[in-house]
Amino acid sequence: MTGRIAGAWAAFVLAAGSMAAAQTYTIIDIGVLKGDNESSGFAINNLGEVVGCSDTKNVQGYPCTGLVPGQHGFSWTQSGGMKDLGTLSGATVSGAIGVNDSGTVVGYSNMKGQIATNFNAVQWSSTGAITNLGTLSGGSSSAAFEINSAGEVTGDSFLSSGIVNATSWTSKKIKNLGALSKAIFTAGLAINDSGQIVGESVFGYGPPFTSHGFLWNGSTMKDLGTLTGGITSVANAINTSGVIVGQSDGSNTRGSWHAVLWNSSDKIQDLGTIPGGTYSIAFGVNDSSVVVGYGNLSNNAAHATVWTSTGGMQDLNSLIPSNSGWVLINANAVNNAGQITGYGTKGGSNHAFLLTPVN
């Protein structure tokens, strides 16, 4: 369910129903690890377990990415609270990016003696034990972004040539999934329980950077293309039915990204923006095709969004209690119960949140 880190790793339709009929949410502050003041929620499983990043470096005002020394991956449950997942032995930074329903978490960590730009894909067991998933042969760095129910993992790895290719890991082996033609950076950002993988291939060193979203179906990589007239797209998440979400530019997007959805036949749909906004991005989708992400308002402020086929694109801030004290900035993932995680500001700091639908 995630591409939200890929941008950092590599360098949201008018509401159709009345507000009375719109889905509303309760909100929980997931908090931070002891001594921290910033956190982000990156993924959520169907049991409501959230994983993400907490900032032990106190780089206040910036969303935690798990790419800065002192930042640590975490897992959180409502009953157990937040747990520091730590790093590989002697390392200084980690990010927890994906989690399956068994509580197995994937992400990345640097290694002892490595600079904080060299990472290895890692996996944490449900008990917190960390495993280095390694890199493709000759590669210096790798990252894991999602794990499915079978324990299949997707992400990326450097090759000895310096090119980055989409990668998968199973209990038996690491596999090079390749790249779209002429790409220099390719990452697998999400995987469903059928083993379908989506992500992006980036072409050239830019600027401008151009990329295309892709779908890997087990043997071949398909270019998902862009909105009409576009040059750039990213596929960030895929659900059980093969519905894919991400972002694309196009001739009608005024030079900005719009959140998009590819249906199970890979036909692309522009999901639009918050009314008055100019851009949007979709980061997560559940099996009911509820889509979450973020977009801008007319004043260019970034707000977390939710999109449904009946309600269109909505600002999540309009769907939580008005006296909550929160400004929700980004929604990264949504589970099949409709619970959403991401990050927002409360009391001047970025904190991870959990939204739960009010039935």
Where are these regions (language model features)?
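Residue-level hotspots at or immediately adjacent to binding/recognition sites across diverse folds
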Residues: 2-359
